[in-house]
């Protein structure tokens, strides 16, 4: 029988080869303050609500 490799401590996506890393800090390209993320989310929600009120489907 074939032996299965054990990927201990790895993310399943990395183990499956779906994500390829060339450098360790590659995912940290976008630095976003949590307060900014919340404000952008609230702004988008308010914009959607206002557009829904102005032009209902």
Curated annotation (Swiss-Prot):
In which compartments does the protein localize? Cell membrane
Which residues does the entry place in the Cytoplasmic compartment? 1-33
Q: Enumerate the Extracellular topological stretches.
A: 56-57
For this record, the Gene Ontology CC terms, alphabetical, are: plasma membrane
- Biological process per Gene Ontology, one example term: protein transport
Sorted alphabetically, the keyword list is:
Cell membrane, Membrane, Protein transport, Translocation, Transmembrane, Transmembrane helix, Transport
Residues crossing the lipid bilayer are: 34-55
Principal subcellular localization:
membrane
Family named by the database record: Belongs to the SEC61-beta family.
Q: How does it assemble?
A: Component of the protein translocase complex. Heterotrimer consisting of alpha (SecY), beta (SecG) and gamma (SecE) subunits. Can form oligomers of the heterotrimer.
HAMAP family xrefs? SecG
Q: What does this protein do, in the record's words? A: Involved in protein export. The function of the beta subunit is unknown, but it may be involved in stabilization of the trimeric complex.
Task: Quote the protein name from its UniProt record.
Answer: Preprotein translocase subunit SecG
């Amino acid at each position: 029988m074939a032996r299965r490799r054990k990927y201990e401590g790895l993310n399943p996506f990395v183990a499956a080869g779906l994500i390829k890393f060339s450098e360790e800090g590659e995912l940290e390209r976008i630095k976003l303050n949590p307060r900014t993320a919340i404000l952008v989310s609230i702004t988008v929600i308010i914009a959607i609500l206002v557009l829904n009120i102005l032009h209902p489907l």
